[in-house]
Design a protein with these regions (language model features):
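Positively charged n-region of N-terminal signal peptides that target proteins for export
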Residues: 1-6
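Bacterial signal peptide processing site
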Residues: 22-24
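A short, solvent-exposed beta-edge/loop patch
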Residues: 118-175
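C-terminal motif of bacterial Sec signal peptides marking the signal peptidase cleavage site
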Residues: 17-20
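N-terminal hydrophobic targeting segments that direct proteins to the cell envelope
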Residues: 26-30
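Repetitive helical segments and hydrophobic/amphipathic motifs
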Residues: 11-12
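Short, solvent-exposed recognition patches
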Residues: 33-140
Length: 175
């Protein structure tokens, strides 16, 4: 008799547990934990970085080789934007950009190399700790040229320490 009672008690307990579980709300499948943030070209937001706004550096006296640069903007974990003077020719601005890149490479531990050979006159390439810059399609490119305003933009792969990128740009234009 005791065995029967114990069995019934066990069955009742199991039924009660099952019933109480069925009242719980189903887990939501739409929630995502720490979604990866895509870096979008021309979209100047922090993209998950620990900063409040994009930082713009302009109106600074540059050395002779960097005088065409009117502004540099960098967003940690996202991108670097170098805007050259509108009253200069494409080739002048390209030379300026390449000099700026070379200067940064020589003066920063965060850059691992520079290569401007065999590229179009509007492109210059460099790497930050071996991570190439990529475009919106994820293709490995290193710069984007915009005919309208001589804007050159460099985009970092996600996960790269953008604070280092920002620091070398700041160093490049202040020394």
């Amino acid at each position: 008799m005791q065995k029967v009672c114990l069995c019934l008690a066990f069955v009742l307990a199991a039924v009660c547990i099952l019933c109480s579980c069925s009242d719980l709300p189903a887990p939501s499948t739409s929630e995502t934990v720490n979604p990866s943030v895509d870096v979008t070209l021309k979209k100047w937001e922090d993209c998950g970085a620990s900063i409040d706004r994009a930082e713009e550096i302009s109106g600074i006296e540059f050395g002779e080789s960097l005088k065409n640069i009117v502004s540099v903007r960098a967003i940690p974990y996202t991108a670097i934007e170098v805007v050259c003077s509108l009253d200069k020719s494409v080739s002048d601005n390209t030379v300026t950009l390449r000099k700026a890149v070379s200067y940064a490479v020589k003066n920063s531990e965060n850059l691992s190399g520079v290569n401007t050979n065999g590229l179009s006159p509007t492109m210059a390439t460099f790497e930050i700790k071996g991570a190439n810059f990529v475009n919106e399609k994820g293709e490995t490119v290193v710069g984007e040229y915009n005919d309208n305003n001589y804007k050159y933009s460099f985009y970092c792969k996600k996960g790269l320490n953008g604070n280092q990128v920002h620091n070398y740009i700041k160093k490049m234009i202040t020394e």
